[in-house]
Structure formats: C-alpha cells, structure tokens
C-alpha cells in the first residue's frame, strides 16, 4: 500500500466529474487500499479517488471513533437512491481544503446503492455522521465541494486564500 499525495484546493482536478468503475480487479482493490492508507495517514474519515487525482467513482470511509477498532468501508460507483426530508447540520472539513471547517446542512438519512470491493451490489441505510460523510464524498465524485454549500462571500474568501497559498507553492489554480 502507498500513501498518495492529496489534491488541494484550488486545483481544478477537484471539479472533475468522476467516471464509473467498469471492472473491479486487483488494480481497483489496490487503489482502494492506497486510498485507505492515505486517508488514515492524513488523518481523515473519508476520501474520494479524485482527491488523489484519480477520476473514478470510488470512495473510502471509516467513521469509527478514536480508540475503536477500524472499520474501513469501500464504495464503488455509489449512488444516493433515497434522501430523508429531515435535515441535519454538521461541521464539515475536507482533506483537500485543509484547516477550514463550515457547517453544512444535508439530508439526515440516506440510502446508498454501491458495489463492494468484491464486485457485489450492496445498499446501506445511513444516518448521522455516516450519512454526512457519504454525501460529502459522493459530492466529490460529482465535482462538488462542501464549500459550495456556504455563502458565496465565504466561499470566495476560502478560494482566494487557497489560491494565494497555491501561488506561493507554484500549484495550479481553478
């Protein structure tokens, strides 16, 4: 397993819409393993493949509490098929937007259909942190960032801050 470098805002790669995974093979399973290692190293609780520059519909999560045994989850081609009308607000952060957090309102409960790392079709009903994290990571697969849910003024300030930091690093900007 390999820790991969993270794509950081304002890199335009983060706005790409990811393509479906066609075949679940050793390469996809290795990618999932690399993503989990990268996520744990960061440390984070979720990571979409696009965040390491791979535009595939693949994400990994682990929302276990610190001190509990790890429960890594792999979602291939995930799709939200049901969302509750009830909403919840969580303070979200993102490994691609380091050290910035904002409250985001999303459906409180969702049902997601996906394919697991063995190629089996699955469905999960999620609420709480798992629902929020799944929605956040699925957004990444669609080129959407959590800052898209905050006011334009705040979003523009965040993008300016990260664009300025990217220029000092010599990185690409949106």
UniProtKB/Swiss-Prot annotation:
InterPro entries: Peptide_deformylase, Peptide_deformylase_sf. The keyword Cell membrane does not apply. The active site is at 137. Its EC number is 3.5.1.88. Binds 1 Fe(2+) ion. Fe cation binds at residues 94, 136, 140. Belongs to the polypeptide deformylase family. It holds the Pfam family Pep_deformylase. One of its GO terms (biological process) is translation. Its cofactor is Fe(2+). It catalyses: N-terminal N-formyl-L-methionyl-[peptide] + H2O = N-terminal L-methionyl-[peptide] + formate. It is an enzyme of class 3 (hydrolase). It comes from the Bacteria. It comes from Rhizobium meliloti (strain 1021). One of its GO terms (molecular function) is metal ion binding. This is Peptide deformylase. Gene3D superfamilies: Peptide deformylase. Keywords: Hydrolase, Iron, Metal-binding, Protein biosynthesis. The gene is def. Removes the formyl group from the N-terminal Met of newly synthesized proteins. Requires at least a dipeptide for an efficient rate of reaction. N-terminal L-methionine is a prerequisite for activity but the enzyme has broad specificity at other positions.
């Amino acid at each position: 397993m390999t820790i991969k470098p993270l794509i950081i805002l304002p890199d335009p790669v983060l706005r790409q819409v990811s393509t479906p995974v066609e075949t679940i093979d050793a390469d996809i399973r290795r990618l999932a393993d690399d993503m989990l290692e990268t996520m744990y190293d960061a440390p984070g609780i979720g990571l979409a493949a696009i965040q390491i520059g791979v535009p595939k519909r693949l994400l990994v999560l682990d929302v276990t509490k610190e001190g509990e045994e790890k429960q890594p989850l792999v979602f291939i081609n995930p799709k939200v098929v049901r969302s509750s009308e009830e909403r919840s607000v969580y303070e979200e952060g993102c490994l691609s937007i380091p050290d910035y957090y904002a409250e985001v309102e999303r459906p409180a409960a969702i049902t997601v259909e996906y394919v697991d790392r063995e190629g089996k079709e699955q469905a999960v009903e999620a609420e709480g942190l798992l629902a929020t994290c799944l929605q956040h990571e699925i957004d990444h697969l669609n080129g959407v960032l959590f800052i898209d849910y905050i006011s334009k003024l705040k979003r523009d300030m965040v993008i300016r801050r990260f664009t300025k930091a990217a220029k000092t690093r010599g990185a690409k900007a949106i």
